[in-house]
Regions:
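Short, well-ordered beta-strand elements within core beta-sheets of diverse protein domains
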Residues: 99-109, 156-164, 220-224
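Structural motif
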Residues: 15-18, 38-39, 58, 98, ...
Length: 242
């Protein structure tokens, strides 16, 4: 968890824009523009759409002149980004826009359920003897818990944890899950689970991964909106296979 207010202040002091990826939190839980950010990015593929059937992104911002930037460019932020969008061709299709607008209708209720389930699972994992560590901003044990409380109204549905053991134990756990789907994406109504060491970060050497805290026993969950008792039962049964 990063201090958005502090980052924005440092960026502005040096004549730079502050951009925040708000995909995990969504506008339901965090509004970076109100915290000093200039640009907010969303992978709308994820929570804003919420149904795993769109590939789309968006930038949100309050328009402003860019004369204060170190490069001295005088056009507005909107004009600059609109030019880049036109030049690059990053324009979504009508059907993609329709699907995201459909998802936005249920964003608030979905995010509340994502968070409730994630918190429940995080607390369960934190007390399990086969789990080494749980990282979820909603837990008091999270090192940036107080910071998260100061800039968000919720903590979302993403969490990571480390299993006691290494690659063999983690692999057995992942092979045993029934409700969770083994996949790299996130933010849909269905629960996903992934193993960064052999999936999203497989190309990074072990020594570099471990410096980043991404060991062979790290697991990431995108907690969906299913019945939480079913999700916990799936996790508990899978941990019993280790």
């Amino acid at each position: 968890v990063l201090d958005i207010r502090a980052i924005a202040e440092i960026a502005h002091r040096h004549g730079a824009l502050a951009a925040v990826d708000n995909t995990f939190m969504t506008p339901a839980f965090q509004q970076p523009l109100e915290l000093g950010a200039d640009i907010v990015m969303h992978s709308m593929t994820k929570y804003l759409n919420g149904h795993s059937d769109v590939v789309m992104g968006a930038l949100m911002f309050d328009d402003q002149p860019l004369t204060r930037l170190a490069n001295g460019q005088g056009s507005s932020l909107y004009e600059r980004l609109k030019f880049l969008q036109n030049a690059i061709g990053a324009v979504p299709g009508p059907m993609d826009c329709f699907l995201v607008l459909r998802g936005l209708k249920t964003l608030d209720v979905r995010m509340m359920r994502h968070e409730a389930n994630a918190r429940w699972i995080a607390e369960f994992l934190e007390s399990h003897p086969k789990i080494e560590r749980v990282l979820y901003p909603g837990l008091i044990s999270h090192p940036q818990h107080d910071l998260a409380l100061s800039q968000t109204s919720g903590h979302g549905g993403m969490l990571t944890f480390t299993i006691k053991g290494g690659l063999p134990e983690t692999t057995r756990f992942l092979e045993a899950v029934k409700i969770f789907t083994l996949a790299e994406s996130l933010g849909g109504v269905e629960s996903l689970i992934e193993h960064p060491a052999i999936m999203t970060h497989a190309s990074i050497p072990l020594a570099e991964r471990e410096k980043l805290g991404i060991g062979d026993n790290l697991v990431r969950m995108s907690v969906g909106i299913e019945d939480c008792d079913d999700l916990v039962a799936d996790i508990e049964a899978s941990l019993a296979e280790i």
